[in-house]
Amino acid sequence: MMKPVNSFTMNYSNVVNLPFVEKLRATRLAGYSTMSLMPADIQGMEQTGRTLADIRSEAADQGVQINRMDPLNTWSRRWVSDNMPDAYTLKTATTAYEFFRICEGLGCTHASLNAMFPLGSMSHDEITEDYIATCKLGAEHGVNIDLEFVPLWGLPSLEMAWNVVRDADQHNGLLCYDIWHHVRSKSDIETLR
C-alpha cells in the first residue's frame, strides 16, 4: 500500500522573497540538498528566457535539487477558496497539465496538493475520486502526489487528509506533513502511528 517517505526539503515559503540564486544559497546554507518551488516562480523565470533545463542545471551547480513543486490547487473539481485574496488564487491557478510539465522538466519527484476549497464543499468520496485521478496523472510523469492538510481549507486536519490518502490506495499517494499545520489543526499525534 503506502511506502514511508521521510524527507526534509527547504520549503519555498521560507525563501519566497529571495532571487533564485539566493534561494539556492539559503537552501544550501541551511543544510538542505532539496527545495520546493511554486509553479509561478518557474513560469516567471521562463518568461525571462530561461528554460527548465537552465533552471535545473543552475540548481544542480549549487548542489540543490528542486524535488517538489508546491502547490497544485486546481486538482479538485472545486478548488477556489472563500478566504484567500484574489491575487493568491490567480498565482496558484496553474493547471495540472502545466504543473506536471514543469515537474517533468525539473525532475521533481513530489507534488504538494492543497485542498484550497472551503471545508464541507466536497464530500469525502468526491475528494478521494479527484485525488485518485491526480495520482494517476502524476504517475504518468513519475511524480508522487503528497496531499497536504491545511487548517484553513477543505482538509483541515491530518486525520481527514490521511483518510483520503488511505482510501485512494495509490502507489504514489502520500501525505505532506507540515508541523505548523499539525499544531494549528490540533490534529491527534496518534494518527501518525
Regions found by a protein language model. Give the residues of each.
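A short, Lys/Arg-enriched amphipathic alpha-helix followed by its capping loop at the start of a domain
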Residues: 3-8, 26-32
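Short, conserved active-site loops that position catalytic residues or coordinate cofactors/metal ions
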Residues: 30-41, 68-74
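Glycine-rich, proline-tolerant flexible connector loops at the mouths of alpha/beta enzymes
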Residues: 36-60, 115-122
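Conserved beta-strand positions
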Residues: 10-12, 35-37, 113, 147, ...
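Boundary/entry segment of secreted carbohydrate-active catalytic domains
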Residues: 2-19
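A short alpha/beta connector and helix-capping loop motif
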Residues: 186-193
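Active-site acidic/histidine proton-transfer and metal-coordination neighborhood
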Residues: 19-25, 60-68, 76-177, 184
